[in-house]
C-alpha cells in the first residue's frame, strides 16, 4: 500500500506543478499578446502597514455602470476604446459573444452590488507613493477570452508611470 501512496503523491505533485506552469504560461501570453486598455481611476488611496505601500484601484467605469438586481454576478463587460486606448463600458453580457470589431471583452464579477473588472490594487516600493499619486489610468492587458492583467498605472498624458529604481 505504501508503494501506491508514494506513486499517488508523485502523480498529484506533477499535476499540480503542471497546472501552475500552465497558468504562468497563460498569463505570460496575455502580457505578450493582449490588447492594452486604459481604465480611468476614481479616487481611492488607503494604505496598509501590514502589506507595505499600495494603491487601491477603483475604476470610474465600474462605478458609473452600477449593476441592477437582474445583472448576473459574473459575466463580460464589453468596452469600446478610443484612439488613446481609454475604455468605456458599452454593455454587460453573460456570454463572450457577440462582440463587434471595435469592442473589447473583460470578465467582471459583482460583489455587494459593486462591479469588479480586474486587479483592484497596485503595490509599489516603499517611498514611491508620490510618483504614483499622478496616476489617472490603470493599464490592463486583455486577451480574447476576457482575462485581464494589470500592467501598470498611466498619467494624464497616457504614459506609463515607472520607478527610477
Language-model features: where?
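Short extracytoplasmic
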Residues: 40-69
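Short nucleic-acid-contacting surface segments enriched for D/E, G, S/T with interspersed K/R
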Residues: 50, 69-75, 127-135
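Short, Lys/Arg- and Gly-enriched loop/turn segments at beta-strand edges
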Residues: 49, 63-73, 87-90, 149
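Generic structural detector for well-ordered beta-strands
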Residues: 38-40, 78, 141
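Extracytoplasmic/periplasmic terminal helices and flexible tails
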Residues: 80, 86-92, 98-165
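Alpha-helical transmembrane signal-anchor/signal-peptide segments
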Residues: 27-43
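Extracytoplasmic
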Residues: 34-36, 54-56, 72-74, 135-137
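Hydrophobic membrane-insertion alpha-helices, especially the h-region
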Residues: 4-23
Amino acid at each position: 500500500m505504501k508503494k501506491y501512496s508514494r506513486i499517488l503523491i508523485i502523480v498529484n505533485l506533477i499535476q499540480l506543478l503542471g497546472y501552475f506552469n500552465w497558468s504562468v504560461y497563460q498569463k505570460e501570453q496575455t502580457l505578450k499578446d493582449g490588447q492594452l486598455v486604459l481604465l480611468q481611476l476614481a479616487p481611492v488611496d488607503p494604505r496598509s502597514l501590514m502589506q507595505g505601500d499600495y494603491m487601491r484601484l477603483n475604476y470610474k467605469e465600474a462605478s458609473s455602470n452600477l449593476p441592477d438586481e437582474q445583472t448576473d454576478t459574473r459575466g463580460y463587460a464589453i468596452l469600446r476604446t478610443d484612439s488613446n486606448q481609454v475604455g468605456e463600458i458599452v454593455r454587460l453580457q453573460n456570454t463572450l459573444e457577440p462582440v463587434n470589431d471595435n469592442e473589447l471583452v473583460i470578465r467582471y464579477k459583482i460583489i455587494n452590488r459593486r462591479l469588479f473588472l480586474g486587479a483592484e490594487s497596485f503595490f509599489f516600493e516603499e517611498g514611491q507613493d508620490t510618483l504614483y499619486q499622478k496616476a489617472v489610468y490603470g493599464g490592463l492587458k486583455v486577451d480574447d477570452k476576457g482575462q485581464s492583467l494589470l500592467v501598470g498605472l498611466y498619467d494624464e498624458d497616457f504614459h506609463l508611470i515607472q520607478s527610477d529604481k
